[in-house]
Swiss-Prot record:
Gene: sox18-a
Annotated protein name in UniProt: Transcription factor Sox-18A
Motif 9aaTAD in this chain: 308-316
PANTHER family on file: SOX TRANSCRIPTION FACTOR, TRANSCRIPTION FACTOR SOX-18
Domain notes: Binds target DNA via the HMG box domain. The 9aaTAD motif is a transactivation domain present in a large number of yeast and animal transcription factors.
UniProt source species: Xenopus laevis (African clawed frog)
Tissue expression remark: Expressed in the adult spleen, lung, heart and kidney, and at a lower level in the adult testis, liver and brain.
Molecular-function GO terms, alphabetical: DNA-binding transcription activator activity, RNA polymerase II-specific; RNA polymerase II cis-regulatory region sequence-specific DNA binding; sequence-specific DNA binding
Pfam annotation, one family: HMG_box
Amino acid sequence: MHRSESSYCREETTLCQGVNSTWVPPADTVPEVSLIPSSPPAPDSPAPSPKPGYGFSTCEEKHGDPRIRRPMNAFMVWAKDERKRLAQQNPDLHNAVLSKMLGQSWKNLTSVEKRPFVEEAERLRVQHLQDHPNYKYRPRRKKQAKKLKRMDPSPLLRNEGFTRGQPMVNLSHFRNLHPLGGSGELESYGLPTPEMSPLDVLEPSEPAFFPPHMREDTDPVPFRTYQHGMDFSQEKTMREISLPYSSSPSHMGSFLRTPTPSAFYYKAHGGSPVCTPLGQLSPPPEAPALDAMDHLNQAELWGDFDRNEFDQYLNMSRTQRPGYSFPMSKLGAPRTIPCEENSLISALSDASTAMYYTPCITG
């Protein structure tokens, strides 16, 4: 017999009246005292099952149900008794070894020997289908604790060995690093020689030779000015420099008449070009000089250029020792050129020289 909802409310109001007050059950719930002794409950009567209204839901009953096993196949039917027999004969063998032995023995059986077990497995499948018509196979999910237990030891060991030496660097430190080209920390160390400097094209084992009249100290023109003045002829100049040359004086003279990029880099406003010694780096470009040369155009640069400056390169070629090659020989390996190619190269060199001198003559 279950109590109604109103009886619970009366009990709560009675308990809240005071501590010293005694609880008196309501009249409808007072059991009647009978002189006749009540008979004990029968032992076979089942205990009353709780109803869902008192905290027991259908979900809890569903979880409490035993898991429905899948029907056994023919191998499982055969191995059920065979495993017991092997375990009794070999009590020291591990279960994995027994499974391997059972699998090998099942493969060695013929189809006639397997037939009774196959028929028994089919009978079990039909019986299972009748007992559980709505059965749907749901594989058990692996517990995450076991997976984490297998994965945890290696990182812990690595962390313990790493923290003894030095603290671990946060990965965000490498993401926040700026590119090497854009960092301002390298500016305080000074920049090396520019890209087209004559010192860059020399081999480390080759000594440099400079005439005495070329060792005067003057300020070099910034490298950006060289790029501004030589953009129109960069492609043709590099194509001519990459061509191999012969040892004939006529071809060497025509080749040296063409202004080299390094010559224009070191001096663009007249005067002799300057080459620093090998052990000394050229200073980095200065910002004030760079801003002052931005407004100059191509005609002004070539108008102030000294035409007789290239004689110094011819003098250097005459005083150069025979054992040393031209500094630009690093770009193209020296080889002998046939006679029919000498005239073509000389004509191309003269045409490029005329193109260089045209702004100087007309301006």
